[in-house]
């Protein structure tokens, strides 16, 4: 089987997978079920860390958690903070491994842009995901950051509409 990146002609298939919209998640038990998906965008993930992070997010009014579903199965999740009107910061974006490289991550970003009339999106990522942001026309700036006394390369990703 050959896997290719999604193209604009695939948008109908992608919208079928995601039911044409993102669903905001507010129930922590429902969110907790998605650990296996979301852990791919966490640093040294554990279920306990995930649950604590979600609890923190749910207590912050500016942070929203959205998912993309097919039937009752979550295919992707995105966590964003609304900085101010028309501006968000992406805290995490993840797609189920069975559905990666089908355009679902791009669909989630584009759906948020349309739904909230976004003019600016900020994200920070590592080398594993910078290609996703580059493919979605984000401007990329590389910088160094210290994690656990270790210098790591990070990327600031910005999309200005």
Predicted feature residues:
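A short beta-loop-alpha structural element at the N-terminal edge
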Residues: 2-34
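Active-site rim helix/loop that mediates acceptor-substrate recognition in acyltransferases
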Residues: 31-32, 36-70, 77
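Conserved active-site alpha-helix within GNAT-family acetyltransferase domains
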Residues: 127-150
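Conserved GNAT acetyl-CoA-binding A-motif
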Residues: 114-127
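Conserved beta-strand in the GNAT
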Residues: 67, 73-82, 87-94
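Conserved acetyl-CoA-binding loop-helix of GNAT-fold acetyltransferases
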Residues: 95, 101-114
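Short hydrophobic/aromatic beta-strand or adjacent loop that forms the aromatic wall/cage
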Residues: 63, 150-156
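Acidic/histidine-enriched, beta-strand-rich ligand/metal-binding domains
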Residues: 47-50, 91-100, 131-135
């Amino acid at each position: 089987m050959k896997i290719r990146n999604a193209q604009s002609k695939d948008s109908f298939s992608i919208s079928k997978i995601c039911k044409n919209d993102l669903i905001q998640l507010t129930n922590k038990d429902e969110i907790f079920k998605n650990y296996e998906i979301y852990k791919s965008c966490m640093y040294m993930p554990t279920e306990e860390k995930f649950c604590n992070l979600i609890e923190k997010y749910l207590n912050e009014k500016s942070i929203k958690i959205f998912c993309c579903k097919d039937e009752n199965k979550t295919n992707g999740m995105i966590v964003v903070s609304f900085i101010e009107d028309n501006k968000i910061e992406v805290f995490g974006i993840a797609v189920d491994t069975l559905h990666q490289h089908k355009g679902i991550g791009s669909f989630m970003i584009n759906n948020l842009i349309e739904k909230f009339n976004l003019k600016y999106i900020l994200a920070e990522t590592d080398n594993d995901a910078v290609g996703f942001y580059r493919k979605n026309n984000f401007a990329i700036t590389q910088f160094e950051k210290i994690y656990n006394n270790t210098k790591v390369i990070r990327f600031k990703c910005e999309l200005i509409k």
